[in-house]
Swiss-Prot record:
The gene is OPG043. This is Monoglyceride lipase homolog. Pfam families: Hydrolase_4 (PF12146). It comes from Monkeypox virus. Disulfide bonds: none annotated. Belongs to the orthopoxvirus OPG043 family. It comes from the Viruses.
Amino acid sequence: MSTNCMFNLDNDYIYCKYWKPITYPKALVFISHGAGEHSGRYDELAENISSLGILVFSHDHIGHGRSNGEKMMIDDFGKYVRDVVQHVVTIKSTYPGVPVFLLGHSMGATISILAACDNPNLFTAMILMSPLVNADAVPRLNLLAAKLMGTITPNASVGKLCPESVSRDMDEVYKYQYDPLVNHEKIKAGFASQVLKATNKVRKIIPKINTPTLILQGTNNEISDVSGAYYFMQHANCNREIKIYEGAKHHLHKETDEVKKSVMKEIETWIFNRVK
C-alpha cells in the first residue's frame, strides 16, 4: 500500500491511497467510503482485492479523514462526485484500456451512482455495499429537521451515528468507536441536508443508470435500510444482481468472518465476469 495526494478543483488537499498488484493490473477499483469514515477502514478489503491482480485506489472525501475541509460538512454534494471522477480519470490515463469499477459503501454508494450516471462510459460496473438511496427510512423528525435547518442553521446538530450499528462483531465496533480518523461528533444539518438531496436525486435517476450493478446488503441495517436496495432492484433497468445477508449490519466488510468471506467472493466473481 502507498499513499499520495491530489488537489481538487477547489485546491483542497485530498489524501489518497493505492494498493497495487505485483503485475500489470487486470482491472482498476475505486473505493468510495461512507459518511464520517475514511479510506483506511478499507485496508483489508483493498488488500484482498489487490491480491487478485487488481489495482485498488481510494481517497478520503473532503471533510473526512486526512483530507482538507470542515469535518462532515459540505455545501454541494456534487463536489464528492467531482473529486471521485477526477481521481478515476487521472489513474485511468495511466492504464488505458483497463476496465474501471466503482465500489461504494453507504454514502459512498450514493456518490458512485451519481458518478456513473454522469459518466456512463467511464465505468465498467459498480458494486454498492449498503447503498444509501432511501431517505424515507430516516426517522421523520430528523428528516424534517435536516430540511428546515440545513440552510438556516447548517451547523445545528440533527443526530449521531450509533457505533453498534456498524457490525455484529464487537471488536469492529470498538475499532470504529476509537478510530481517531472517524468523525464521532453529531451530524450537522447542512451536511444531512446535502445527503438527503443527493439520495432524492439518486431515486429519480436510477431508471436511467446503464452501468451493471451488484448490491450487497444486510437486513439489520439501521443506517441504509434494506428497502433502498430493493428500490434500486425494482426501478433500475441496468444489468443488476443483489446479495442479501440475513442479520448483517451496516459495514459488511467489517461483519462476521462468514459475511466478509462471502462479500469478497461476490466482489471477485462480479469483477472477473467482466474482465477479459
